[in-house]
């Protein structure tokens, strides 16, 4: 019966799947949706997600303390559990009020996935769900042997595992410290709204051992590491996990932000800080002012002995940091370089904790403080020098452009081009420039009395008349010269005609004389 569930999905019809879901489920699941019937995420069931499988093993303890399940049964249930995972992704489980009215618990998608794959094991109380370290160690060993761990897959796995750890820790501390009447509802809302996943909080699994949630987010660390002690081992594991690639990514991101915002010297947040998972209807978290927060931080609020932790979901740079979990407060993860070359420093407990002033039972928790100015002195100096260099270069370019334009205007650069043009244009330009110079000289003369101005005006008019007369005389002289030339020609013709007349007369006389003789 280990292969029961939805293993025969592709050869069963939708009606059989619906009946099997309703009748075989021991935990009162809601009515299956279209995704559960196999009409949407069917193609995604062939390849099981290793990270989700790893989270389910860590959360549910490998089948609820059932060591008799073999590796073959786990492999047969991967397709069925992944198919049901698509339908219950955004649903909060139904509280089993009929079984135990005193101990309501949240049934999330992780619990429903493992139970839907194996129906031999009924639901037990949270007290009976003690996780055996041996089973968890076997699950982790099988996971490491099954999938080869590359840098990208390991970073993604560590990020998701650290998010799961932080969600469980903050929910548990909130449920302990907050009011009893608001504790259950707030925890349910936080579980329902935490990044789209539903996790069991620590307060609802009181019998979990300290080795369940290791402060280290590595895939090869020992599960028997104590949760709230021996911080040196945790820091060493975390420092071994962080690689040179993420450190370079962090430095490049910080340089980009410094280049953008360094004119004022302050980093301005690009994302909203303190994105809590509570709805707006709950007035306890309706008005919150973020204070004293740096990048990759989990803020902390103290109120005269009452501790309330706010999870800051600002992870813009490195999303693989494991936030250390202490019994009293949650610290910030610092990105200082460690001694090892290929790793970052271990997360250090931050001393810059935010405090909240006000009564304990107030509906609005007001956190007032000022932003920390991020210390980027070296990067700020570099960027300022770079900006100054750019500014000087731009000014030099503008000056060079002005000089070039002035030289072009005076003809010292484009003289060869101007020589190629015709003489007429050149003469015209020279004449125009001369006239403009004369006009400037006339305009620049000092002011004279009115009678002198009249005399000067009369003189100018006389000069104009003289010029016109000279032009007329020259024209007439030219005409006269032409006429005289014509007269001379006529006179020559007249003389020639007179000579011809005389010759003709002589010839007539000779002829008459000859006729008389005959």
From Swiss-Prot:
Q: What does this protein do?
A: Involved in symbiotic signaling. Required for root infection by symbiotic rhizobia, infection thread (IT) formation, and nodule development. Probably not involved in nodule organogenesis. Involved in arbuscular mycorrhizal (AM) symbiosis. Required for fungal infection of the outer cortical cell layers, and for arbuscule development during the AM symbiosis, by binding, as a complex comprising CCaMK, CYCLOPS, and DELLA, to RAM1 promoter cis element thus promoting its expression. Acts downstream of CCAMK.
Outline the inducing conditions: Induced in nodules 21 days after rhizobial inoculation.
| Effects seen without this gene | No visible phenotype under normal growth conditions, but roots of mutant plants are impaired in the interaction with both rhizobia and the arbuscular mycorrhiza (AM) fungus Glomus intraradices. Stunted growth when grown in nitrogen-limiting conditions and in presence of Mesorhizobium loti.
Q: Which family does it belong to?
A: Belongs to the CYCLOPS family.
Gene for this chain: CYCLOPS
Quick one: where is this thing mainly located?
nucleus
Protein name per its UniProtKB record: Protein CYCLOPS
Arranged from A to Z, the UniProt key words for this protein are: Coiled coil, Nodulation, Nucleus
List where Basic and acidic residues composition bias occurs: 433-443
